[in-house]
Amino acid sequence: MPEAEILFSETSHYLKAEDVTQLKNAYLFGQGAHSGQFRKSGEPYISHPLAVAGILSKLHLDVPTLTAALLHDVVEDTDISKAEISERFGESVAELVDGVSKLTKIE
């Protein structure tokens, strides 16, 4: 079973169906935003945000946190803006994504 399907299956045990749908939408959005980007290992870039979301799902974290995990590099590494994340997934998700992006700039 592909990693994304595992995430959706695992989260369906503790999230509502509409929340799992949001995760699927975030995954597809992130996959599209990172299209053509690859990790140093050669894997598609989306594999990293998906792995982060998978780890957080084992802690049974909420849907905004998991959504932000799937999107955490989108603003930093693509042309997608925080405003677009907010429009599509809500202000709380956009703030989480923005906060993670700012962590990389702390010295």
Map each language-model feature to its residues.
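Active-site helical microenvironments for divalent-metal-assisted chemistry
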Residues: M1-E107
